[in-house]
Amino acid sequence: MVTASSSKATGATRLKQANKAVKEPSPDDEFLESDSEVDEFAEGFQPGLAEEYSDDDDDDEGKEDDGEGYGYEESEEEGNAKWEPDNWDGNEDTVSESGSDDDEDAELRNLQNNLNSLPLSTLAKAQKSLSRKSSSSSSNGRSKEEKLALMKSKLAQMQRSKGKAVAVPDTDSHRFGSRAQESDEESDSGPETTSSTKRGSKHAPAALSTKKQVSRKRQVIEVPKPERRDPRFSSVSAGHANADLHSKSYSFLPDLLRQEFSGLKEAVAAAKKAEKNCPWAEKPMRTAERERLEVQMGQVRTKLVRTEKEAMEREVLAKAKKEEREKRTQGKAAWFMKKGEKKDLLLKARFETLEKQGGKTAVKKLVEKKRKKLASKEKKSRPFAKGAEGMGRDTKRRRVA
C-alpha cells in the first residue's frame, strides 16, 4: 500500500510539472514553424517511441488520469512539441487507384464505340496516311552512306545485266547487311514488277513473270480453226460461177429495179409537193419522209447503174472473144487481150453507150468532169512556188493556179 501511494504521488508531481512547462513559453518556440509537427531542436527525440506504443489515444489519456505511468511519456523539459503518428488509411489509395482504373476503362470503351461507328472508308484512309508517314519517316532515317551504297549496287547490277564490265564495285553494300537490302526492297517494290520482266538486250530470251499462273489447259497440237462457208458461193460445192449463165437466169432483175426506181421517183416528187403545202407542225415529219425516199431511190439507182454497166462490159468482152475465135478459124495465131487493151476497149464502149443515151453533150460533160478532177490532183501534188520558201518571205505554202 505504501508503494502504491508513493507511485501515485510521483505521477501527480510529474503531471503538474508538465502542465507548467506547457504554459510557460520556451525561447526555442520562435525558431519552430507554425505547421511543424516535429521539434527539430529536441535533444532526446526518438522517432521509434510512438511506434512501440501504438495504443489508442483514449486509453493513454485514461491511464494518465488514473496516474498509472508506464514511462513512455516524453519529458516536457527536454522538448516543446510532441510527435504524434498520422492517421493514415491505406484503403484510400487503393480506392483512388481503382477509381482511376475504372475511368481508363470507360475512356477505352468510348474510343472503341467511336471507332466502331466510323465508316470503313474513313478507317482505310487513316490507315493509308499512317503507312505513308511511317514509310516517309523510315526513308528519311536512312543515312547518306546507305543511299550511296544502294545506288552503287544498283549501277553494278544494271551493268552486269547488260553484259558490260562492272566499273563500280558493290562491296560497300555488304557493310550494312540485311538492313540495306530490306530498305532497297521496300523502296523498289513498285517499279520492280515492271522492270523484272524487261530484257537486258534484244538478243536475250523473253522473260515472264513467275507470279502469273500458267493455265493447266495447253494446246499441244495447233488445230486449224473451222471456217464456215455458204455452199451457194463456195468454190468446192458450186464450182466456178458463170456470169453469162447467171445473167440469163436472173434477167428479170434489171426490169424489177427499173420499175422500183420509177415508182420511187414518183414518190419523191409527191413527198416534195406535200412538204411544200403541209402545215408548219407537220414540216419535220414530211422532211424526214422525203429524205428517206431520196436515200432509197439513190440505192436503187446505184444498183441499176451497176447492173447495166456489168451487162455492157459482158456484152463487149463476149463480142471481142467471138471475133478472136473467128480469126483463129481463119488460120491466125492465138491472141490474148492485155489489161490495158481491155481497159481501153471498155472505155470506148462506155462512151458509145453514153452517146446513144444522151448525145455528144453528155460525153462532153463527162470528159470535162474528168479533166477537172485530174487538174485538182495535179495542183495538190505540185511543189512550192518559186521564191515562196526562204529569202525572208512568208513560208506559207502557195499553190499555182
Curated annotation (Swiss-Prot):
UniProt KW keywords: Coiled coil, Nucleus, Ribonucleoprotein, Ribosome biogenesis, rRNA processing
Protein family according to the UniProt entry: Belongs to the RRP36 family.
Stored InterPro entries: RRP36 (IPR009292)
Quaternary assembly: Associates with 90S and pre-40S pre-ribosomal particles.
Compositionally biased residues, Acidic residues: 27-42, 52-78, 86-106
Disulfide cross-links: none
rRNA processing recorded as keyword: yes
GO CC, one annotated term: 90S preribosome
Bias kind Low complexity: ranges: 109-141
Superkingdom of the organism of origin: Eukaryota
Full protein name: rRNA biogenesis protein RRP36
Compositionally biased intervals (Basic residues): 367-383
Coiled coil (UniProt feature): 257-313
Region Disordered: start-end pairs: 1-245, 358-401
Localization annotation: Nucleus, Nucleolus
Polar residues bias spans: 1-10
Species: Cryptococcus neoformans var. neoformans serotype D (strain JEC21 / ATCC MYA-565)
Primary role: Component of the 90S pre-ribosome involved in the maturation of rRNAs. Required for early cleavages of the pre-RNAs in the 40S ribosomal subunit maturation pathway.
A biological-process GO annotation: maturation of SSU-rRNA from tricistronic rRNA transcript (SSU-rRNA, 5.8S rRNA, LSU-rRNA)
Principal subcellular localisation of the protein: nucleus
